Amino acid sequence: MNEFLSLLSRAQTILLMLRLAVTAVAVFLAIVAWTKTRTQETVCFIAGVLCMYLAQLFAFLRAAGFSITRYTPVPGVSLVGFTLELLPLACFIASLIFTIKRHSI
């Protein structure tokens, strides 16, 4: 853990941990909401929140020095990290599309 603190500044470390904690709360609330509703747009939105937590967890593990993947199509950017950053947005877009279709906005 000392290497982790030496790689990042104190402010970056606190921000990363706060983002992880806040997204964990969002995931808990998403799981509670998932038990209450089963519409397509809600499920896509909840999946986006879950994917966002995975992206934060991946960023935390990567910053802590854990190398999860070795394949990098672009130097410095892993395929897993790239996918985890874009997947929540894709889920949110799908949720909005289902909402527009359902309510004919």
UniProtKB/Swiss-Prot annotation:
Its main location: membrane. It is found in: Cell membrane. It is a multi-pass membrane protein. One of its GO terms (cellular component) is plasma membrane. Keywords: Cell membrane, Membrane, Transmembrane, Transmembrane helix. The chain crosses the membrane at residues 14-34, 41-61, 80-100. This is Uncharacterized protein TP_0679.
